């Protein structure tokens, strides 16, 4: 580890790494010295992120994957375990935003997709990578949440309910592992950020009024470098 490469020698896995906050975080982690496993569905988009990582002098491995496919996460964990003895950092940035609509008009398929991505996949990730995270000297998990998970808003019930479950999974896991290992779990609300998901939710909003994903990524790297206590939560404004 050096001052300009504080995460040198560490391995990180980022879901939702093909765009937005996930892509920015993956790039920032690599620039800080970590080898980053990039997980998302779109190969071309992952390759573009990998190119940016190479431009900043970092290294990465592409892992194209649909987190909602049966056994996909278990296969990924097996592949990672076959190459690395530990996983130092798990950043869960993947999320699915269903159409904003009154609760009575939620489309079942949309809601199911949100549940599978935001809830079921999260539990599967924590379970599958638990052994590798515990083997790390100081394993860390960061989950990116949303304020609608604990502050219900009209038309946001489909997404908000899945983020509430997301938070519960992470908080519970964090309490469980804190008693038995140095592994720590944090939940971070990135706040209003210039992403495609934000543009879908607020189509009339001026994107220039929002902070870029890189600001969120910078804070996450800072948090991972400095370390954090069990149960850490914060919002990035």
What are these regions (language model features)?
Residues 183, 187-188, 195, 203-237:
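C-terminal helical subdomain
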Residues 11, 18-19:
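Conserved glycine-rich cofactor-binding loop
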Residues 96, 134-179, 192:
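Catalytic loop of short-chain dehydrogenase/reductase
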Residues 74, 95-112, 155:
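Conserved mid-core segment of classical short-chain dehydrogenase/reductases
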Residues 15, 87-95, 118, 143, ...:
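Rossmann-fold scaffold of SDR-type NAD(P)-dependent oxidoreductases
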Residues 104-123, 142, 166:
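Catalytic Tyr-X3-Lys loop
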Residues 32-48:
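Conserved glycine-rich Rossmann-like NAD(P)H-binding loop of the short-chain dehydrogenase/reductase
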Residues 78-82, 117-137, 175:
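Amphipathic alpha-helical dimer-interface segment in Rossmann-like NAD(P)H-dependent oxidoreductases
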């Amino acid at each position: 580890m050096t001052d300009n490469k504080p995460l040198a020698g560490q391995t990180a896995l980022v879901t939702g790494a093909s765009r937005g906050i996930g892509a920015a975080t993956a790039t920032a982690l690599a620039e800080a010295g970590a080898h980053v496993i990039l997980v998302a569905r779109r190969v071309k988009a992952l390759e573009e992120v990998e190119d940016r990582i190479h431009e900043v002098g970092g290294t990465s491995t592409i892992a194209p994957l649909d987190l909602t496919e049966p056994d996909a996460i278990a296969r990924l964990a097996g592949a990672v375990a076959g190459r690395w003895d530990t996983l130092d950092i798990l950043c869960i940035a993947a999320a699915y935003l269903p159409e904003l609509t009154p609760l009575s008009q939620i489309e079942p398929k949309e809601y199911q997709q949100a549940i599978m991505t935001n809830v079921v996949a999260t539990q599967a990730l924590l379970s599958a990578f638990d052994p590798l995270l515990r083997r790390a000297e100081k394993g860390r998990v960061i989950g990116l949440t949303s304020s609608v998970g604990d502050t219900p808003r009209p038309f946001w019930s489909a997404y908000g309910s899945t983020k509430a479950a997301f938070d519960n999974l992470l908080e519970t896991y964090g309490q469980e592992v804190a008693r038995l290992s140095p592994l720590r779990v944090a939940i971070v609300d990135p706040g209003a950020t210039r992403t495609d998901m934000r543009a879908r939710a607020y189509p009339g909003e001026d994107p220039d009024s929002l902070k870029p994903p890189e600001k969120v990524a910078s804070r996450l790297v800072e948090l991972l470098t400095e370390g954090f206590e069990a149960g850490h939560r914060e919002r990035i404004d």
